[in-house]
A protein has these predicted regions:
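Extended amphipathic ligand-handling, pore-lining, and cofactor/metal-binding catalytic surfaces
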Residues: 1-166
Length: 166
């Protein structure tokens, strides 16, 4: 109502943890200064069970222990938003232009996404690969300093013996 927005962050694997941030919110609420609505934005543009869903699970687990539960909304992906795509294009285009001005030739631009086990997509129907592909297409189609056909999509961070998306 007063236009005040408070931004906090929480992590699953390191401090500040979800429960710590929630404790702080409850303390503020008791003082009459806490937000009445929470907007949860996981910092992964593309939805994946292993990232976004696990964050939602952690929040739900924390909510199940509490008496006061705020109104909340979860943004499950933002890979197609103009702000995300346009900012990505600006960053990539400016770096390419900088390299070209230094006399460097750009033969290929590789846009990488975090890797994921293939079973999550094939067996479970996870949207991650599709979201990554959409992100890749939306960015490369707007780039001014390199042709789309000189852009390649790849995945990184493979771990273990399972088959990973490529």
């Amino acid at each position: 109502p007063n236009g005040h927005v408070e931004v906090n962050h929480a992590f699953l694997l390191s401090p500040p943890y979800v429960n710590e941030v929630y404790d702080s919110w409850e303390d503020d609420l008791k003082k009459g200064i806490g937000a009445t609505k929470l907007l949860v934005i996981p910092m992964f543009p593309q939805y994946s069970e292993s990232t976004i869903a696990s964050g939602i699970d952690a929040l739900a687990k924390e909510l199940s222990k509490r008496v006061k539960i705020p109104t909340f909304e979860v943004i499950t992906n933002f890979h197609r938003t103009h702000a995300f795509i346009d900012n990505s294009v600006i960053q990539v285009d400016s770096k390419i232009k900088e390299l070209q001005q230094q006399g460097k030739k750009i033969d290929n631009l590789i846009i990488t996404f975090h890797g994921m086990q293939k079973r999550r997509i094939v067996n479970k129907g996870d949207d991650y690969y599709r979201h990554c592909y959409e992100t890749f297409c939306l960015i490369t189609n707007k780039l001014k300093n390199i042709k789309t056909e000189k852009c390649t999509m790849r995945f990184q961070s493979r771990f273990g013996s399972e088959e990973w998306i490529t």
